[in-house]
């Protein structure tokens, strides 16, 4: 059963960061527009490199199982924060769905922070007791 669990965690680690890696890449390639949008929403533009680091870098870290527990905690917190900053105006149609999506994603990352990266991960290779 342990092997099935490890494969399941690996599949989750592959699926969960897809949104973050693609969103981070979009922010890299559309830096100026993203910075303007953030500032229009009241978030200082100087925060964008940190957002990119968390989305793109954190997404890759989760994908490969590197610093998984810590990255998953930061990503869960970031996702909750973005839910409240960018999706809490439920009068705008899709925001309630986006808000709930972010809550769900945060739950997945919290679960990953608790369970760890599984056997098929860089963390496992670096430290046998993940």
Curated annotation (Swiss-Prot):
Periplasmic face of the membrane: 27-45, 92-101
Keyword Metal-binding in record: no
Sequence similarity: Belongs to the DoxX family.
Subcellular location: Cell inner membrane
Membrane topology qualifier: Multi-pass membrane protein
Cytoplasmic topological segments: 1-5, 67-70, 123-130
Native source species: Escherichia coli (strain K12)
Identification of the protein by name: Inner membrane protein YqjF
Positions in coiled-coil regions: none
Pfam families found in the cross-reference section: DoxX
Keywords: Cell inner membrane, Cell membrane, Membrane, Transmembrane, Transmembrane helix
TM segment ranges: 6-26, 46-66, 71-91, 102-122
A GO CC annotation given for this chain: plasma membrane
